[in-house]
Amino acid sequence: MLMIRTIVRPEKVHEVMQGLLDAGYPAVTKISVVGRGKQRGLRVGDVVYDELPKEMLFVVVPDADKDFVIRAILDHAKTGDGKFGDGKIFVSAVEEVYTISSGTKETEPTLAAAKEA
């Protein structure tokens, strides 16, 4: 299993979440965050904004679905104007997943079945 974390512009978050839903991934965690990239924020005249608002989304997927989910995120998060600041995607391994209410340990087939439900 993999955790895909993506940081996107606030104005694109609903489009990305809908894209994930349409791709069969309804289970998403969303957190409002602030941060800056390599450009060190944004300058507007004499005003410098060190930290810019972004949204972070988390989704856990079977290994085999990684490229499909990344493509869904890219297709919906990119602004198309070629500017910096559209966000990042991070992929990391998930060793175990448990459902708190039941204590059940989930597996990749469980995640795949939830996607298809």
Outline where the language-model segments fall.
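Positively charged, small/polar-rich N-terminal and surface patches that mediate targeting and assembly
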Residues: 1-117
